Amino acid sequence: MPFKKINIAIDGPSGVGKSTIAKQIANKFNYLFINTGSLYRAIAFFCQKNQISITSERKMIKHLPPNFLSLDFEGNVWLQNQNVSNLLRNDLISKNAAIIAQYPQIRKIVTEILQNFQKNHKGIIMEGRDTTYNVMPDADLKIFLWADAETRAKRRLKQNTFLNLETDFQEILKAIEHRDYLDMTRKTNPLKKTVDSIFLDTTNFTRDQIVSQISKLVFRKIGQFSLEI
């Protein structure tokens, strides 16, 4: 029996596990997973590829062609006629995406794409900063994930070690704290928890435990009983 479709928004700081957890929830309930940050990464990738400076929002906007960025209903990100979903994960793109994401006009472009995409559709789970109050303000279920910076840095270090990436814990911690500062202090749509979001502190819980907690919230929302203990 298929699950009833609702829309879910998951917010929280960098490195808290939003993507991993949202993907597991999406797979469990057969929902479509969208990483909203991938659109900012795609713009950063486009600028890098076309040698467009990101130091000035006004100048950058001039070089972005109309309708150059889109999503499909498998959650893939497209730049014009190219699926770039698997090309967006490197340190430079991450760094540039954090800069680009502070620009009001860029955030407006991305938000419009995401809102048009979800219009009249259910069964979508979106994760990303400002998802709960700007991108999906009418989501049926809103989750705000949290973990202290040190815990997030340890998780990132473990992940990098698994991927055979040489990284220093202090460098990771410093980068996470800097990203938190940028996200919390930016003028346009800063990182914050909304009144109607459910706060889950993941610091002392495993990923599977958090997935289980969120699953129970989803079951409750869709009016079905969970068999999970």
From Swiss-Prot:
InterPro entries: Cytidylate_kin, Cytidylate_kinase_dom, P-loop_NTPase. GO terms for cellular component: cytoplasm. Keywords: ATP-binding, Cytoplasm, Kinase, Nucleotide-binding, Transferase. One of its GO terms (biological process) is pyrimidine nucleotide metabolic process. ATP binds at G12, P13, S14, G15, V16, G17, K18, S19, T20. Its EC number is 2.7.4.25. GO terms for molecular function: ATP binding; CMP kinase activity; dCMP kinase activity. It catalyses: CMP + ATP = CDP + ADP; dCMP + ATP = dCDP + ADP. It is found in: Cytoplasm. It comes from the Bacteria. Gene3D superfamilies: P-loop containing nucleotide triphosphate hydrolases (3.40.50.300). Belongs to the cytidylate kinase family. Type 1 subfamily. This is Cytidylate kinase. It comes from Mesomycoplasma hyopneumoniae (strain 7448). The lineage of its organism: Bacteria, Bacillati, Mycoplasmatota, Mycoplasmoidales, Metamycoplasmataceae. The gene is cmk.
